[in-house]
Amino acid sequence: MMRLALALSMLATSALAQEDLKIDQTKIYVSEPSACQVLERQGLDALIEGDFLTLSFADGIQSMEFHCNFYDVKSRPNTPLLFVDAVCESPGDVYPDILAIAPMGEDTIQVVSSNDAMMVNTGVYEPPGPTTNPGVTLYTRCPNLSEIPVD
């Protein structure tokens, strides 16, 4: 009985800790942490040369040949989780997507794409690895960027 109480208290503590985390919707997030500095130096040119995704709540998710427009970002009281309706485009393909976004740390968010998860589960995409769930991408917040510089 003592073990059960201890396990439940640990679960409650981690849930409370996650509720304290906030997603800063005014900043740019990148799929590769080193991309923040590259974006600061090169602006939009970094997207041409880089192999990473950017996420902003104003512009959606983008890379050189991929873009997801966010149409609706929903939140609920007492939870840091976000629900996003999106329309995504890649060369020759347009599709709707639903994203779940959760804070994973002070400057990291987890984005789960229902479309990507379905594509992995049906064998269209390769699984991301043994420790990563299908459809999950981690993004790191760029502390100095609220928009991508255009020179």
Positions of predicted regions on the chain:
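Sequence contexts marking disulfide-bonded cysteines in secreted/extracellular proteins
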Residues: 35-39, 67-69, 87-89, 141-143
